[in-house]
Amino acid sequence: MTGVQTCALPISRPDEEGELALRPGWPSMFRGYLHEPERYAKCFVGGWYLTGDLARRDADGYFWFVGRADDIIKTAGHMVGPFEVESALMEHPAVAEAGVIGKPDPTIGELVKAFVVLKPGHAADEQTRLDILGFARKRLGAAVAPKEIEFKDQIPRTRSGKIMRRLLKARELGLPEGDLSTLEGSS
């Protein structure tokens, strides 16, 4: 970001992940949450604004987006970014779309579950599911790859095209769906 001092906390060497932090004070920075000063104050640590985005810095000093901190899946001692898993799944020739969540599991904390929309001409059957699971394990490793895959006709997205992972998770766990005003196709 031109003119804005950035860092990723607590990164000290290249290719480590951390939360993207910005020095406040640029003209377009938001000034607070309406009627929630405590929430706004929690966004700052040591003079840095914590964005909630995870990033890694490469050897040239460039930052690469990893995912949202609140989307991170904690599974068997690993921190898994859903974007990483979704991107790998999208490389499979049968996969048109993918959305990934963490599903509570008493043994490993959360298991990685993927919701997949298939490309035309591919069957939503056990063989396809096993093929995609195997593909993901080879790309990501057994600890990061999904343990479950569910085929869907569509993945819920916001009007701006972002996957609504919180909605996938709420529906999976039978929880209230919350605010759907940004859901693509809602009126």
Where are these regions (language model features)?
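Short, acidic, Ser/Thr-enriched surface-loop or helix-capping motifs
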Residues: 15, 58, 106, 157-158
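Ser/Thr-glycine-rich phosphate-binding loops at phosphate-binding pockets of nucleotides
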Residues: 9, 51, 75, 158-160
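Short loop/turn microsegments at loop-to-beta-strand junctions
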Residues: 18, 46, 51-52, 96, ...
